[in-house]
């Protein structure tokens, strides 16, 4: 937020949820909206959020000491003095969202909302890499993709930005709708619909409907970009959206690409794939479709594109002597797991070993989906399976992979020790599980052996 807001602006943004305001000096401008006193500097406004294990109101004294000139609270606070403005609201999280929505409305740049069951973060990073060839890009950082993170992302917008990419995650109905109402994207992109969070929503159709809330709540003059290869997404989207639509896909669509080795072929033009795997070719095609939507010269990408993904997402490391680690430990779902196993099977090497853990939030589908993962390991003819067996569902992976040499470990250190004694030159390993399983710590311990990214 390089262009400062006045306290009058804050009052305007909060009009629908404001109970009272004291010590308001309309000509005073704030530097930033801050929810964490550890990063607050003099001239900031402190907004006291509440969480399951914290209450931001407890940190108001620290905020004042650090130089906060205004606070947003959901209860009256004594001892602020006569120079600190207090905005009393019904709910500070709602207030945070209203301020972010008001700030976003000051920008006329393309705002791209990205969601999907699988690949939304990778697609966001590919879009950012593409758009950075044409201007200054602002994007969702880390996992700031929920009801708190999206406002934070929007409040970081500045007049220097030419494009903004807002990732939107959900764990239930109504959440994407809320995020779209706040961000008001000019383009809404849905990568796919799968089974992630099926234990919470109950069915793939319910997941599709939740994802398509993006379409229902983006402005009617905006554009939808949809993965034509995902039949359920396309069927569901028709019920939510009748506006301008661009489809993309490896099987068909307005932007139709094909994979030829390590290249994506589009309209006779060969583009080097920034990331390995057919699933990532589809994600890259989504970014190209977006570039076309914006009228950008995507053919400039023939010289190649570099994408730096967050830790645990499509990262490759060289370990020891000619051993490659494929790190996919940040998060997981059935479709993502199966695609990553395909990637491992198609990675040149001597032995291909899967190091897997459980997939979370599958509910009653858990045993069946995990058995499908094991069956995939067996069908691909992988050379070995290592399981971090800290979840009962990993037994179903082992059962599905019956016939594949399988080793199970109850904790990360014992798994690391076994891998160090097992690995041979030419081995290719895939590490894949839901983030909460802790398989990322196994990769981190192995990386202590001084690896290099590849």
UniProtKB/Swiss-Prot annotation:
<dbReference type="InterPro" id="IPR013221">
    <property type="entry name" value="Mur_ligase_cen"/>
</dbReference>
<keyword id="KW-0133">Cell shape</keyword>
<dbReference type="Pfam" id="PF08245">
    <property type="entry name" value="Mur_ligase_M"/>
</dbReference>
<dbReference type="InterPro" id="IPR005863">
    <property type="entry name" value="UDP-N-AcMur_synth"/>
</dbReference>
<dbReference type="InterPro" id="IPR004101">
    <property type="entry name" value="Mur_ligase_C"/>
</dbReference>
<keyword id="KW-0436">Ligase</keyword>
<dbReference type="GO" id="GO:0005524">
    <property type="term" value="F:ATP binding"/>
</dbReference>
<dbReference type="InterPro" id="IPR051046">
    <property type="entry name" value="MurCDEF_CellWall_CoF430Synth"/>
</dbReference>
<dbReference type="Pfam" id="PF02875">
    <property type="entry name" value="Mur_ligase_C"/>
</dbReference>
<keyword id="KW-0963">Cytoplasm</keyword>
<keyword id="KW-0961">Cell wall biogenesis/degradation</keyword>
<dbReference type="GO" id="GO:0008766">
    <property type="term" value="F:UDP-N-acetylmuramoylalanyl-D-glutamyl-2,6-diaminopimelate-D-alanyl-D-alanine ligase activity"/>
</dbReference>
<comment type="pathway">
    <text>Cell wall biogenesis; peptidoglycan biosynthesis.</text>
</comment>
<dbReference type="InterPro" id="IPR035911">
    <property type="entry name" value="MurE/MurF_N"/>
</dbReference>
<dbReference type="Pfam" id="PF01225">
    <property type="entry name" value="Mur_ligase"/>
</dbReference>
<keyword id="KW-0547">Nucleotide-binding</keyword>
<dbReference type="GO" id="GO:0008360">
    <property type="term" value="P:regulation of cell shape"/>
</dbReference>
<keyword id="KW-0132">Cell division</keyword>
<dbReference type="InterPro" id="IPR036565">
    <property type="entry name" value="Mur-like_cat_sf"/>
</dbReference>
<dbReference type="GO" id="GO:0051301">
    <property type="term" value="P:cell division"/>
</dbReference>
<dbReference type="InterPro" id="IPR036615">
    <property type="entry name" value="Mur_ligase_C_dom_sf"/>
</dbReference>
<dbReference type="InterPro" id="IPR000713">
    <property type="entry name" value="Mur_ligase_N"/>
</dbReference>
<keyword id="KW-0131">Cell cycle</keyword>
<protein>
    <recommendedName>
        <fullName>UDP-N-acetylmuramoyl-tripeptide--D-alanyl-D-alanine ligase</fullName>
        <ecNumber>6.3.2.10</ecNumber>
    </recommendedName>
</protein>
<keyword id="KW-0573">Peptidoglycan synthesis</keyword>
<keyword id="KW-0067">ATP-binding</keyword>
<dbReference type="GO" id="GO:0047480">
    <property type="term" value="F:UDP-N-acetylmuramoyl-tripeptide-D-alanyl-D-alanine ligase activity"/>
</dbReference>
<dbReference type="GO" id="GO:0005737">
    <property type="term" value="C:cytoplasm"/>
</dbReference>
<feature type="binding site">
    <location>
        <begin position="116"/>
        <end position="122"/>
    </location>
    <ligand>
        <name>ATP</name>
    </ligand>
</feature>
<comment type="similarity">
    <text>Belongs to the MurCDEF family. MurF subfamily.</text>
</comment>
<dbReference type="GO" id="GO:0009252">
    <property type="term" value="P:peptidoglycan biosynthetic process"/>
</dbReference>
<comment type="function">
    <text>Involved in cell wall formation. Catalyzes the final step in the synthesis of UDP-N-acetylmuramoyl-pentapeptide, the precursor of murein.</text>
</comment>
<dbReference type="GO" id="GO:0071555">
    <property type="term" value="P:cell wall organization"/>
</dbReference>
């Amino acid at each position: 937020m390089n262009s400062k807001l006045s306290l009058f602006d804050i009052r305007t943004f909060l009009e629908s949820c404001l109970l009272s305001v004291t010590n308001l000096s309309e000509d005073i401008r704030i530097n930033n909206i801050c929810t964490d006193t550890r990063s607050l500097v003099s001239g900031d406004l402190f907004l006291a959020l509440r969480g399951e294990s914290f209450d931001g109101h407890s940190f108001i004294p620290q905020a004042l000491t650090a130089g906060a000139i205004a606070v947003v609270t959901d209860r009256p606070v004594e001892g602020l003095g006569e120079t600190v403005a207090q905005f009393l609201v019904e709910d500070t999280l709602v207030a945070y969202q209203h301020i972010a929505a008001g700030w976003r409305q000051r920008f006329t740049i393309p705002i791209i909302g990205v969601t999907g069951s699988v690949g939304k973060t990778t697609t966001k990073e590919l879009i950012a890499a593409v758009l950075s060839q044409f201007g200054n890009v602002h994007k969702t950082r880390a996992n700031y993709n929920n009801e708190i993170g999206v406002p934070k992302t929007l409040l970081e917008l500045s007049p220097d930005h030419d494009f903004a990419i807002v990732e939107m995650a959900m764990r239930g109905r109504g959440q994407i709708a809320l995020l779209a109402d706040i961000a008001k994207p000019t383009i809404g992109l849905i990568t796919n619909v799968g089974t992630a969070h099926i234990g919470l929503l109950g069915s793939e159709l319910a997941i599709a409907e939740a994802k398509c809330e993006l379409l229902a709540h983006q402005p009617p003059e905006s554009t939808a970009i949809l993965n034509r290869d995902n039949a359920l997404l396309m069927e569901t989207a028709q019920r939510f959206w009748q506006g301008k639509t661009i489809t993309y896909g490896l099987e068909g669509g307005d932007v139709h690409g094909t994979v030829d080795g390590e290249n994506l072929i589009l309209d006779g033009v060969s583009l080097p794939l920034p990331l390995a795997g057919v699933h990532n070719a589809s994600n890259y095609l989504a970014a190209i479709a977006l570039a076309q939507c914006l009228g950008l010269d995507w053919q400039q990408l023939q010289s190649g594109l570099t994408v730096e993904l967050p830790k645990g997402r499509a990262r490759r490391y060289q370990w020891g002597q000619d051993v490659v680690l494929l790190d996919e430990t940040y998060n997981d779902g059935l479709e993502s797991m199966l695609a990553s196993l395909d990637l491992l099977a198609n990675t040149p090497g001597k032995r291909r070993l899967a190091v897997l853990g459980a997939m979370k939030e599958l509910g009653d589908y858990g045993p069946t989906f995990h058995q499908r993962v094991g069956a995939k390991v067996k069908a691909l003819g992988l050379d070995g399976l290592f399981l971090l067996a800290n979840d009962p569902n990993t037994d179903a992976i082992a059962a599905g992979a019956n016939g594949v040499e399988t080793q199970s470990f109850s904790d990360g250190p014992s798994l690391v020790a076994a891998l160090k004694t097992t690995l041979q030159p030419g081995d290719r390993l895939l590490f894949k599980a839901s983030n909460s399983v802790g398989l990322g710590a196994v990769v981190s311990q192995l990386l202590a052996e001084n690896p290099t990214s590849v």
